[in-house]
Amino acid sequence: MAIRLILEAPDPRLRTISTPVEAVDDELRALIADMFETMYDAPGIGLAAIQVGVPKRVLVIDLQEEEDAEGKPIRHPRVFINPELFDPSEEQSVYNEGCLSVPEQYAEVERPAVIHARWLDEQGAKHEERLEGLLATCLQHEMDHLEGILFIDHLSRLKREMVMKKLEKARRARKAA
């Protein structure tokens, strides 16, 4: 396992449309292990393969919503290979979203509150599930990455430009430090 470099906006590779996974094999499982290690290290709750420079339709999510007796997050890692969404609800929900590729920037994004999804796991098993709440939002956010879309693309032009200016200012400050 290895921690990989997370691409940051405005890196043009983030705009790449990811291709379907042809085979669930040990090479893919190694990528998935690296993705989890990278996501936990960042820290984050979701990561798409394109964010580490691999244009494949793979993403990992772990909401880590529970804690153990010592206050450490309880991990519930989930792998989504070639995910598909269908039958989104008309009802919308709004979450204050962030992104490891747009570090330290957050904005409210409206998405369907309930979705249905189908995908393969890291063993190649098929799954289909109704998702809601933060998991539904996170899956939609990560699936946007597979299409070359960032959460800031859901914002008005003015808000998007403000986020990008803040991002560039923070990047310059990190380099100067």
UniProtKB/Swiss-Prot annotation:
Record Gene3D superfamilies: Peptide deformylase (3.90.45.10)
Enzyme class, UniProt record, top EC level:
hydrolase
Which residues take part in binding Fe cation?
A: C99, H141, H145
Active-site residues, record numbering mapped to chain: E142
Report which reactions are catalysed by this protein: N-terminal N-formyl-L-methionyl-[peptide] + H2O = N-terminal L-methionyl-[peptide] + formate
Q: Which InterPro entries match?
A: Peptide_deformylase, Peptide_deformylase_sf
Q: Which UniProt keywords apply?
A: Hydrolase, Iron, Metal-binding, Protein biosynthesis
Asked if the record carries the keyword Chloroplast, the reply is no
A molecular-function term among this protein's GO annotations: peptide deformylase activity
The free-text cofactor remark is: Binds 1 Fe(2+) ion.
Known cofactor(s) = Fe(2+)
Q: Name one GO biological process term.
A: translation
Q: What EC number(s) does its UniProt record assign?
A: 3.5.1.88
Q: Which family does it belong to?
A: Belongs to the polypeptide deformylase family.
Q: What is this protein's function per UniProt?
A: Removes the formyl group from the N-terminal Met of newly synthesized proteins. Requires at least a dipeptide for an efficient rate of reaction. N-terminal L-methionine is a prerequisite for activity but the enzyme has broad specificity at other positions.
* NCBIfam families per record: pept_deformyl, PRK00150.1-3
* Protein name (record): Peptide deformylase
UniProt lists the gene as def
